[in-house]
Amino acid sequence: MARVTVEDCIDKVENRFELVLLASHRARLISQGASITIDRDNDKNPVVALREIADETLSPDDLKEDLIHSLQKHVEVDEPEPDPASMIAAGGAAAADSEEQDDLPETITFDQMSEEELLAGIEGLVPPEKSDDY
């Protein structure tokens, strides 16, 4: 990359590290088939990306937003908040349901094993073969 190209870009993007991130993201987009906004002049994709930033054919803010969006794994969706009145009505119905469920006995059962059955099971275990791992 030509030093002149990087120095031209510093006027547009003040932080060199951010410039590298934006230019590399744009170069990847070009490699994936995005159309370029300047003449290629037999330059490679990173140089083309830097020249696009230097010539201001792309907005650094748009590139930054696109980079952030491409790195996000979970996109937040703004959902409308429910009405307080409907929440109060739903809360009363849920309280009635929970009172009915409290009256039901819990049916959790575990397998019961006597001490003799446990000892017989332990004696029947085969020890692992020794290895040189430890």
UniProtKB/Swiss-Prot annotation:
Record-level Gene Ontology MF annotations: DNA binding; DNA-directed RNA polymerase activity
Presence of the UniProt keyword Nucleotidyltransferase in the record: yes
UniProt keyword annotation of Cell cycle present: no
Gene Ontology CC annotation, any one: DNA-directed RNA polymerase complex
Top-level lineage group: Bacteria
Protein known as: DNA-directed RNA polymerase subunit omega
UniProt family annotation: Belongs to the RNA polymerase subunit omega family.
HAMAP family, alphabetized: RNApol_bact_RpoZ
The reaction(s) this protein catalyses: RNA(n) + a ribonucleoside 5'-triphosphate = RNA(n+1) + diphosphate
Taxonomic path: Bacteria, Pseudomonadati, Pseudomonadota, Alphaproteobacteria, Hyphomicrobiales
Pfam families named among the record's database cross-references: RNA_pol_Rpb6
Biological processes per GO annotation: DNA-templated transcription
Subunit structure: The RNAP catalytic core consists of 2 alpha, 1 beta, 1 beta' and 1 omega subunit. When a sigma factor is associated with the core the holoenzyme is formed, which can initiate transcription.
Function, in words: Promotes RNA polymerase assembly. Latches the N- and C-terminal regions of the beta' subunit thereby facilitating its interaction with the beta and alpha subunits.
Species name: Rhizobium etli (strain ATCC 51251 / DSM 11541 / JCM 21823 / NBRC 15573 / CFN 42)
InterPro entries for this protein: DNA-dir_RNA_pol_omega, Pol_omega/Rpo6/RPB6, RPB6/omega-like_sf
EC number per UniProt: 2.7.7.6
Residue ranges of the region described as Disordered: 76-102
Keyword annotations: DNA-directed RNA polymerase, Nucleotidyltransferase, Transcription, Transferase
